[in-house]
């Protein structure tokens, strides 16, 4: 007699405390992605200490970000905020000459009601450099939402940024489009523009674009682009598609304010997710996919050595970076058992396609659909972990050491944020991260770890 497996997703919401990095940490990868930018954080010394300790960049390295520390005079309104920011931005222009300055507002600027949005337009007209204001403060649910805030603010500039650059440089076309290389000519279908949004390393973005190019789908641009002057043109009739699950605010901005058309698709994490991502995009342009099934099979074949290590193992997601649904779906497809998916925040509309793929994957693998807990209570989670005893807990850094001290295998979820995990070619990196603590403990057991400890 076979047990019936539920085919419905179960959502729960707790009101417990959750621990994550501050969203201003998004500067650590965005300043490297947007090469002609400069990030100016407006906050207290605490924000400065956090950035210095988190990024670990020395002063003499001259990174393209800085901290505007608020003093008592700023908080008590004894100083002129506009003049202080103007002085800093003029110095930034003189030293670095960026094409855009991005102000990152923090919790303190919210509390003292600093009008950054009101000062930015006046100041940018004075110094001749675009200034974008993003409120990436600690009031968000997860640190990855800092990128979401920055991209949503940057989306408003996509239509006007080329005109601004022409006026500033006095030239019609400062950056001409790259020429097609010989032997790489591809006949694209006559379809509307497609822009992808989400920050990825340049080499990963250059892997995803060719995957669509093989299907005769042309990517007109990325948000963010490698240079601010290369932002895509957005507007009515332009299709957009996200590559990360924590960009719901950007998606809403593109649809509501820029009148773009959002393609709801799973996210390109793992071979199954990448194939589903492409299969959602192509029909929108009346293009039939070719060779995707063979491409996915080829990748799964190359992952057999890792899959043999994780098959039958159990994993518990405590929730930290909003990548949990996509990672859980991929690991279930690899044969793992997911007890629980904790997630700091869930936008069911934006992640609808990913949730549907999670359900279909569980049905295909004949495993129960894990329950999804939004804003999990960490104390309740620890109790459930003690009861379930999973082989691996993917958790934030705050809980990793306490769990390790109790004999639990852990993996920092922040590592998945910075690792290259998107696309067919990088599926191996996900399993490398997941299996590392498992392989490490197996090697210690072979050395007689118990005897050594005693």
From Swiss-Prot:
<dbReference type="InterPro" id="IPR005970">
    <property type="entry name" value="Protochl_reductN"/>
</dbReference>
<dbReference type="GO" id="GO:0016636">
    <property type="term" value="F:oxidoreductase activity, acting on the CH-CH group of donors, iron-sulfur protein as acceptor"/>
</dbReference>
<keyword id="KW-0479">Metal-binding</keyword>
<keyword id="KW-0004">4Fe-4S</keyword>
<dbReference type="GO" id="GO:0016730">
    <property type="term" value="F:oxidoreductase activity, acting on iron-sulfur proteins as donors"/>
</dbReference>
<keyword id="KW-0067">ATP-binding</keyword>
<feature type="binding site">
    <location>
        <position position="107"/>
    </location>
    <ligand>
        <name>[4Fe-4S] cluster</name>
    </ligand>
</feature>
<keyword id="KW-0934">Plastid</keyword>
<dbReference type="GO" id="GO:0051539">
    <property type="term" value="F:4 iron, 4 sulfur cluster binding"/>
</dbReference>
<keyword id="KW-0560">Oxidoreductase</keyword>
<keyword id="KW-0602">Photosynthesis</keyword>
<protein>
    <recommendedName>
        <fullName>Light-independent protochlorophyllide reductase subunit N</fullName>
        <ecNumber>1.3.7.7</ecNumber>
    </recommendedName>
</protein>
<dbReference type="GO" id="GO:0036068">
    <property type="term" value="P:light-independent chlorophyll biosynthetic process"/>
</dbReference>
<keyword id="KW-0547">Nucleotide-binding</keyword>
<dbReference type="Pfam" id="PF00148">
    <property type="entry name" value="Oxidored_nitro"/>
</dbReference>
<dbReference type="InterPro" id="IPR000510">
    <property type="entry name" value="Nase/OxRdtase_comp1"/>
</dbReference>
<dbReference type="GO" id="GO:0046872">
    <property type="term" value="F:metal ion binding"/>
</dbReference>
<comment type="similarity">
    <text>Belongs to the BchN/ChlN family.</text>
</comment>
<dbReference type="GO" id="GO:0009507">
    <property type="term" value="C:chloroplast"/>
</dbReference>
<keyword id="KW-0408">Iron</keyword>
<keyword id="KW-0411">Iron-sulfur</keyword>
<dbReference type="GO" id="GO:0005524">
    <property type="term" value="F:ATP binding"/>
</dbReference>
<keyword id="KW-0149">Chlorophyll biosynthesis</keyword>
<dbReference type="GO" id="GO:0019685">
    <property type="term" value="P:photosynthesis, dark reaction"/>
</dbReference>
<dbReference type="InterPro" id="IPR050293">
    <property type="entry name" value="LIPOR_BchN/ChlN"/>
</dbReference>
<comment type="subunit">
    <text>Protochlorophyllide reductase is composed of three subunits; ChlL, ChlN and ChlB. Forms a heterotetramer of two ChlB and two ChlN subunits.</text>
</comment>
<feature type="binding site">
    <location>
        <position position="47"/>
    </location>
    <ligand>
        <name>[4Fe-4S] cluster</name>
    </ligand>
</feature>
<comment type="pathway">
    <text>Porphyrin-containing compound metabolism; chlorophyll biosynthesis (light-independent).</text>
</comment>
<comment type="function">
    <text>Component of the dark-operative protochlorophyllide reductase (DPOR) that uses Mg-ATP and reduced ferredoxin to reduce ring D of protochlorophyllide (Pchlide) to form chlorophyllide a (Chlide). This reaction is light-independent. The NB-protein (ChlN-ChlB) is the catalytic component of the complex.</text>
</comment>
<feature type="binding site">
    <location>
        <position position="22"/>
    </location>
    <ligand>
        <name>[4Fe-4S] cluster</name>
    </ligand>
</feature>
<keyword id="KW-0150">Chloroplast</keyword>
């Amino acid at each position: 007699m076979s047990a019936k497996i539920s085919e419905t997703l179960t959502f729960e919401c707790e009101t417990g405390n959750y621990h994550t990095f501050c969203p201003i940490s998004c500067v650590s990868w965005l300043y490297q992605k947007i090469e002609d930018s400069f990030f100016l954080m407006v906050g207290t010394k605490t924000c400065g200490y956090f950035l210095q300790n988190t990024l670990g960049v020395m002063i003499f390295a001259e990174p393209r970000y800085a901290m505007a520390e608020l003093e008592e005079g700023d908080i008590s309104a004894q100083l002129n905020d506009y003049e202080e920011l103007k002085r800093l931005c003029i110095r930034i222009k003189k030293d670095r000459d960026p094409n855009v300055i991005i102000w990152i507002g923090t919790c303190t600027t919210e509390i003292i009601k600093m009008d950054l949005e009101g000062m930015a337009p006046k100041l940018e007209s004075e110094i001749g450099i675009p200034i974008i204001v993003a409120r990436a403060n600690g009031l968000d649910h997860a640190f990855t939402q800092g990128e979401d805030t920055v991209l949503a603010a940057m989306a408003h500039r996509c239509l006007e940024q080329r005109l601004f650059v022409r006026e500033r440089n006095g030239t019609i076309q400062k950056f001409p489009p790259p020429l097609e290389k010989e032997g790489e000519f591809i006949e694209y279908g006559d379809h509307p523009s497609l822009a992808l949004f989400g920050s990825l390393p340049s080499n990963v973005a250059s892997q995803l674009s060719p995957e669509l190019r093989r299907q005769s789908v042309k990517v007109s641009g990325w948000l963010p682009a490698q240079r601010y002057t290369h932002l895509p043109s957005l507007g009515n009739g332009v299709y957009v598609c996200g590559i990360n699950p924590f960009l719901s605010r950007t998606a809403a901005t593109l649809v509501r304010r820029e009148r773009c058309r959002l393609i709801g698709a799973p996210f390109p994490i793992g071979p199954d997710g990448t194939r589903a991502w492409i299969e959602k995009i192509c029909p929108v342009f009346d293009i039939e996919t070719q060779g995707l099934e063979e491409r996915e099979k080829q990748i799964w074949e190359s992952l057999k050595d890792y899959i043999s290590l994780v098959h039958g193992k159990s994993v518990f997601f405590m929730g930290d970076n909003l990548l949990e649904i996509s990672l859980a779906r991929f690991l279930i497809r690899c044969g793992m058992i997911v007890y629980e998916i904790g997630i700091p925040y869930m936008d069911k509309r934006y992640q609808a396609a990913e949730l549907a793929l999670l359900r279909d994957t569980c049905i295909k693998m004949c495993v129960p659909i894990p329950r999804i807990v939004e804003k999990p209570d960490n104390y309740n989670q620890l109790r459930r972990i003690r009861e379930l005893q999973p082989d691996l807990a993917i958790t934030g850094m705050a809980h990793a050491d306490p769990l390790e001290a109790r004999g639990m295998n852990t993996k920092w979820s922040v590592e998945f944020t910075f690792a290259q995990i998107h696309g067919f070619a990088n599926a191996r990196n996900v399993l490398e991260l997941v299996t590392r603590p498992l392989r490490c403990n197996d090697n210690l057991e072979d050395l007689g770890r118990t005897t050594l400890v005693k």
